[in-house]
Amino acid sequence: MQRIHLIMLMILSSQVVRAQSADPQYAIIIKGGHVIDPKNNINELMDVAINKVGKIAAVLKNIDPKTASRVVNAKGLYVTPGIIDMHTHNFAGTEPDNYLRNSYYANQPDGFTFRVGVTTVVDAGSAGWRTFEKFKDQTIDRARTRVLAFLNIVGEGMTGGPPEQNNADMDARLSADMALKYNDLIVGFKVAHYNKPDWVPIDRAIEAGKMAGNIPVIVDFGGSGLSLEELTMKKFRPGDIYTHTYGGGGKEREAITDPLTGKLRPFVFEARQRGVIWDVGHGAASFSFSHAIPATKAGFFPDVISTDHHGGSMNSAMKDILNVMNKFLTLGMEVPAIINSVTWKPAQVIQREQLGNLSVGSEGDVTVLRIRKGKFGVFDQMGQRLEGKQRFECEVTVKGGRVFYDLNGLTNPLPKVVGGLPSL
């Protein structure tokens, strides 16, 4: 009898060993692609493996495809860290006449992210300290996209109109307290749409940033007519962000180019040298080739490429993050620099260095891109059109080791969708 039990135990043990040996080491391998990982200075053919807890496990040549549950065929394609769009508006809701705060003009993220390679968005001030928890419950906690946020220095958030001019609702202490409470989600503070000729919102946002652990401020300079040089050379700390870099012009908002000569203002480079971050924030009417062409000819490309994605920009000259990247490709920005501006650089700016790179242990977010050659047009809100010879297209988007988007079925086996969440 004991002998029978021993034999049965041996059989069961051997079955367990076989099951363990048959269990693949990785959840997914992205195989045969040209990897561009700016943090780690990788720019060559490599394979990327993601483990079963959704973290980067290896970036090596010739990883055995049999060691993964799924394999993405990336031959002829570019493989990058998951794209970070650092300027979006996602506080969608049903309140009328509230612009981008819990209203119709903002967009739920998932329908506009994975299909263009975006795995992380940073909402740029749609909510303030009074409204952030509603935004968290309504959007952040329910999205498949990773949603982080700049908190508006205006407590009510980005309602448009008079509330955004209310100095009494710009409370540095209460804003900082909310950022500290949700320091896993709030990455900085936003100033926007302010039209008075004073520095109140910027001073209070910077104060809040210091109180909340020295996190950055991002500024849409509104229509106050104040000096861009003073903002970037005196007010800003290293790491603070100027958005809508290639927009503006006129008396209400200074541009980075001189209106008389059309040339780049010298202080722009000086501000970069002291640590100021220059963000595209394309938007519906905040990007003009009349500024971008002379700036890029002078060698002034953006630190961060972002969209300012909302209902008014998504079907205009902006469209999506890939289209904005295409504009800078057409303007002569090198591919690795473009990838850096939507991956590792924004991750550093928002102090989330587990994102935007393919280091072992980082989040298993990967974007697979095709660079298609041909004739392609890009244009700005003023109707100026440029023609390019290549453009980015998204083939596959992986977030946390799960395939959330696959344009042409390059994943084998293709994931089944269970309850709206792709299977591992």
Question: Positions of the model-derived regions?
Answer:
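C-terminal cap of metal-dependent C-N hydrolases
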Residues: 33, 363-417
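Active-site core of metal-dependent hydrolases
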Residues: 188-315
